[in-house]
């Protein structure tokens, strides 16, 4: 197994651990609300009966169904949401392209051949003064890669290819799907925890129901921080994987390092907060300058890239 493959395997284990934690918390919240709904006398016994379907866990099932429906809706509209608010252009190889558009398309084809992939993401150019890029799509069949015009103008050929390789790696690793699911689960968990503190709480006099209420009250306080930490950890792990994937496809870590340095310097020297207001795609960006970012620091990403044995 190569160094790259080991990194991917390790990060997949970490990802699975975080996803398992998310699902466990999600189910636990639903079961607590169900315990309150049935006015449980003993919380432990009630949870066991709900988990073994001796008592039907109505709220828990409804939560999972709602999550599933929202995910389906997002699958149909996610790409348009990610591109919203900007002037953008599809690079359509069946039409006449500019020299720069031709170059970008050729770079993508080279990477697809190198990775032995049999799908071609749609390529978009976003007319924007900031340097950034992102990938979107539920799976390979509806995937896209978007690059800002400033990024295309200021990076050299190898740096641009490395950025496309980074975004292509996100698609290969199913990162967009993962980010979407985690975000939806987080929001539903927070909503249910918050509302359940005020609903189902009427005259619940049994000790089990009151204990469930108390646990939900505590979760209402700590869940925002817990989900933020889990999302940051998960997303940062995926960024390291995508950086490694770019270096692997390029057979060189230097172009990705140079691209990250240039993008970081651009955000250091300019304030783009009022220009780029699409918060939905902040977690999907190649670079995120916020303090509590879903991305690792540029310094850590470069250090990690320099350790890669290509």
Swiss-Prot record:
Keywords carried by this UniProt record: Cell inner membrane, Cell membrane, Hydrolase, Membrane, Metal-binding, Metalloprotease, Protease, Transmembrane, Transmembrane helix, Zinc
Active site location: 167
UniProt GO MF annotations: metalloendopeptidase activity; zinc ion binding
Recorded superkingdom: Bacteria
Subcellular location: Cell inner membrane
Positions annotated to bind Zn(2+): 166, 170, 239
Principal location: membrane
Transmembrane segments: 16-36, 55-75, 182-202, 214-234
Protein's UniProt keywords contain Heme: no
Necessary cofactors: Zn(2+)
Topological relation to the membrane, as annotated: Multi-pass membrane protein
Enzyme Commission number, as recorded: 3.4.24.-
Cofactor binding remark: Binds 1 zinc ion per subunit.
Family: Belongs to the peptidase M48B family.
Alphabetical list of NCBIfam families matching this protein: PRK02870.1
Protein name as it appears in the record: Protease HtpX homolog
Organism: Helicobacter pylori (strain J99 / ATCC 700824)
């Amino acid at each position: 197994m190569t160094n790259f493959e080991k990194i991917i395997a390790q990060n997949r284990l970490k990802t699975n651990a975080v996803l398992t934690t998310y699902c466990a918390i999600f189910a636990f919240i639903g079961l607590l609300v169900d315990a309150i709904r049935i006015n449980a006398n003993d919380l432990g016994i009630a949870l066991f009966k709900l988990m073994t379907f001796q008592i039907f866990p109505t709220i828990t099932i409804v939560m999972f169904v709602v999550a599933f429906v929202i995910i389906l809706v997002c699958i149909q509209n996610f790409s348009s949401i990610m591109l919203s608010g900007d002037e953008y252009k599809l690079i359509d190889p069946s039409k006449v392209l500019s020299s720069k558009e031709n170059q970008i398309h050729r770079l993508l084809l080279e990477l697809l051949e190198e990775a032995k992939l049999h799908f071609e993401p749609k390529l978009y150019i976003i007319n924007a003064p900031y340097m950034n890029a992102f990938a979107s799509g539920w799976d390979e069949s509806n995937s896209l890669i978007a690059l800002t015009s400033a990024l295309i103008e200021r990076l050299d050929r190898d740096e641009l290819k490395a950025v496309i390789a980074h975004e292509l790696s996100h698609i290969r690793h199913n990162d967009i799907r993962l980010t979407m699911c985690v975000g939806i689960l987080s929001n539903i968990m927070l909503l249910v925890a918050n509302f359940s503190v005020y609903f189902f709480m009427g005259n619940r006099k049994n000790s089990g129901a009151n204990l469930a209420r108390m646990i939900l009250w505590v979760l209402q306080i700590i869940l925002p921080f817990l989900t933020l930490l889990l999302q940051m950890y998960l997303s940062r792990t995926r960024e390291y994987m995508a950086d490694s994937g770019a270096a692997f496809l390029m057979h060189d870590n230097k172009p990705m390092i140079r691209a990250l340095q240039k993008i970081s310097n651009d955000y250091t020297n300019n304030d783009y907060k009022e220009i780029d207001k699409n918060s939905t795609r902040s977690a999907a960006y190649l670079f995120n300058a916020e303090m509590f970012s879903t991305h690792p620091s540029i310094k850590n990403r470069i250090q990690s890239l320099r350790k890669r044995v290509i």
